[in-house]
Amino acid sequence: PMQDDMDTILTNIREKLIAGVEKRLDADAPVGFLLSGGLDSSLVCSIAAKKLGKPIRTFAIGMDTDAIDLKYARQTAEYLGSEHHEIIINRDMVINSLEEVIRLLGTWDITTIRASMGMYLLCKAIHEQTDVRVLLTGEISDELFGYKYTDYAPTADAFQQESQKRIRELYMYDVLRADRCISANSIEARVPFGDLDFVRYVMAIDPEKKLNSYGKG
């Protein structure tokens, strides 16, 4: 691992992520942004909004029964002043789309299928109801930075090995989900966190510095 100190690491992560977003904003078709209200997609949206200097178009999805994600996405959209769209789905819509999503994914992995339902229905609605044909998403951040695994990793080496494994297997899970669900609806997915310069830098950070030693999320 490289030996940059924490201040240098934070500066480089910030600059490289901004560059990763910026280079993906150029498109010959209208661009939209998937916004869950979580940190990853919110960062992508905030960088883009600042760089473009005009309201971006954000899209969020939620169930009609418990739309907690919609609440946080709405808060972020209001803060950014985006042109925000909410797609509300219900149990029947999910069940009716299940076979089609499994066919698209070509996998029986339950977690991948479950996580794909919302993305598929959201992209279907975007394709049918708007002219957006390019979508930026917050994918891959969890695999790079560890997400919940940093709370439980027994050692820094174990964390690094798990992170490397998740990156190697991305095409089987999160990338598979995003690629199939988005492209099936004739939309191009762009993933700033997957920028090669960004990924190489983050994966070279001393894993000790990635472990959750702060007792916070």
Regions found by a protein language model. Give the residues of each.
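ATP-dependent adenylate-handling active sites, centered on carboxylate activation for C-N bond formation
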Residues: 2-215
